[in-house]
């Protein structure tokens, strides 16, 4: 049977600061630029969660997208929306909050709760 992918899009807003605590303020500013601002900055994130698998012949689903949306909201959006990622999101603490690391942490939060293969986390900060 053929494998297919389905994608669910969610959105959240959050503040953060890019910095490596082992570096000086000058080095953080040199590497991360204005994103190292001590007063934080924010983004309107768009999150795409891609799952794949074979279609269940009885339901026509790889996964019910409403169920996937509920999992994403419970595990990610409710915890990250209108929060400071560095200070208020337990699974982001002690992590440099780049888009890449946010995607990795979101993957780790979702992988055990999704009843299909989690194949891609895409996050954008337009």
Q: What label would you give each PLM region?
A:
Residues 1-120, 124:
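Charge-rich, low-complexity N-terminal segments
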């Amino acid at each position: 049977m053929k494998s297919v992918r389905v994608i669910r899009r969610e959105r959240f807003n959050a503040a953060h600061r890019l910095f490596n605590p082992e570096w000086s303020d000058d080095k953080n500013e040199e590497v991360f630029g204005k994103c190292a601002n001590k007063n934080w900055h924010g983004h309107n994130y768009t999150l795409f969660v891609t799952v794949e698998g074979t279609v269940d012949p009885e339901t026509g689903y790889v996964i019910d997208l409403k169920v996937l949306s509920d999992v994403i909201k419970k595990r990610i959006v409710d915890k990250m929306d209108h929060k400071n990622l560095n200070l208020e999101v337990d699974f982001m603490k002690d992590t440099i909050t780049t888009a890449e690391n946010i995607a990795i942490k979101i993957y780790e939060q979702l992988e055990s709760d999704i009843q299909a293969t989690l194949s891609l986390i895409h996050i954008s900060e337009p």
